[in-house]
Swiss-Prot record:
GO biological process: epidermis morphogenesis; fertilization; negative regulation of G protein-coupled receptor signaling pathway; positive regulation of G protein-coupled receptor signaling pathway; protein maturation; proteolysis; seminal clot liquefaction
UniProt-recorded name of the protein: Kallikrein-14
UniProt-annotated catalytic positions: 83, 127, 220
Similarity remark: Belongs to the peptidase S1 family. Kallikrein subfamily.
Domain Peptidase S1 span(s) in chain numbering: 41-265
Organism: Homo sapiens (Human)
Induction line: Up-regulated by steroid hormone.
Length: 267
C-alpha cells in the first residue's frame, strides 16, 4: 500500500502518500522532481485549461515546493488530504502549467490547518484537512469553488480525478500541465477484495476493472469529482498504480459534509 504523496529527500521504504514537489518562484512555478516523486494521473489526458477551476496546488516550506493537490470549497477555504499537512503551506489557484507563470494564477498563504480530529496516519482513515487562506481568492473563470456532495456515489458512477502526479508507474514521469482521467466508483466488494480489512466507511474506491487508469503519487489530496460535485480526495493505493483489480482509494467526502460545514463556519 502506498500513500499518494510526494515528499522531499530520499524515498520512504514503506507506504508513500501522493505528493508532488515543485518550486514556486515569485512570478512563476517551476516544477522540481525529488527522489520521492512517484505518482501522477495514469492513463489520462491533459485537462482543458480552466476546466477544473477548483483545482489547488499545495506548496510547502519557505521554498514553496509543490506537495499535493486540493480543491477550493469557498473563497477562503481549501480541502486536501490530512497526510498533506506541513508546518508552512501556501496554495496556488488558477494553475494549469506548473512550469510557467500564468496570468490566472493566485498564490495565497495558509493561516490555519484543520485536520479531521479522528485522522489516523497508520490506517489512513479520516484522511482530510481544511486549509483557511489568509485572504479570499478572486473568483473568476479560472478559479471557482466546488460543492461537497451530500450523497454517497453508487457503484459505476462516472467521475473525474485531476492532478500533477506521475503519468507512469512504477517509473515516474511528471507532466507540466494538469492531467485528468475518467474513472468509476468501484463496488464495495471489489474494494474490500483488493484491500482486505483495510477499507472503512470513510473511504471509497474508484478506477476501472481492466486497470490502466488511476491517480498516483503526486496526486494526493486532489479532487475526485462526480456529477459536478466533490465526491472524494486522492488518499492511497498500491505502490504501483493502475493495476487491474486494485482501484485507487479516496477519502469518502459524503461522510464528512457536516464536519466540513461546521469547521468552515467556525472561523
Amino acid at each position: 500500500m502506498s500513500l499518494r504523496v510526494l515528499g522531499s529527500g530520499t524515498w520512504p521504504s514503506a507506504p508513500k502518500m501522493f505528493l508532488l514537489l515543485t518550486a514556486l518562484q515569485v512570478l512563476a512555478i517551476a516544477m522540481t522532481q525529488s527522489q520521492e516523486d512517484e505518482n501522477k494521473i495514469i492513463g489520462g489526458h491533459t485537462c482543458t485549461r480552466s476546466s477544473q477551476p477548483w483545482q489547488a496546488a499545495l506548496l510547502a516550506g519557505p521554498r514553496r515546493r509543490f506537495l499535493c493537490g486540493g480543491a477550493l470549497l469557498s473563497g477562503q477555504w481549501v480541502i486536501t488530504a490530512a497526510h498533506c499537512g506541513r508546518p508552512i503551506l501556501q496554495v496556488a489557484l488558477g494553475k494549469h502549467n506548473l512550469r510557467r507563470w500564468e496570468a490566472t494564477q493566485q498564490v495565497l498563504r495558509v493561516v490555519r490547518q484543520v485536520t479531521h480530529p479522528n485522522y489516523n496516519s497508520r490506517t489512513h482513515d479520516n484522511d482530510l484537512m481544511l486549509l483557511q487562506l489568509q485572504q479570499p481568492a478572486r473568483i473568476g473563470r479560472a478559479v471557482r469553488p466546488i460543492e461537497v456532495t451530500q450523497a454517497c456515489a453508487s457503484p459505476g458512477t462516472s467521475c473525474r480525478v485531476s492532478g500533477w502526479g506521475t503519468i507512469s508507474s512504477p517509473i515516474a514521469r511528471y507532466p507540466a500541465s494538469l492531467q485528468c482521467v475518467n474513472i468509476n466508483i468501484s463496488p464495495d466488494e471489489v474494494c474490500q477484495k483488493a484491500y482486505p480489512r483495510t477499507i472503512t466507511p470513510g473511504m471509497v474506491c474508484a478506477g476501472v476493472p481492466q486497470g490502466g487508469k488511476d491517480s498516483c503519487q503526486g496526486d494526493s489530496g486532489g479532487p475526485l469529482v462526480c456529477r459536478g460535485q466533490l465526491q472524494g480526495l486522492v488518499s492511497w493505493g498500491m505502490e504501483r498504480c493502475a493495476l487491474p483489480g486494485y482501484p485507487g482509494v479516496y477519502t469518502n467526502l459524503c461522510k464528512y459534509r457536516s464536519w466540513i460545514e461546521e469547521t468552515m463556519r467556525d472561523k
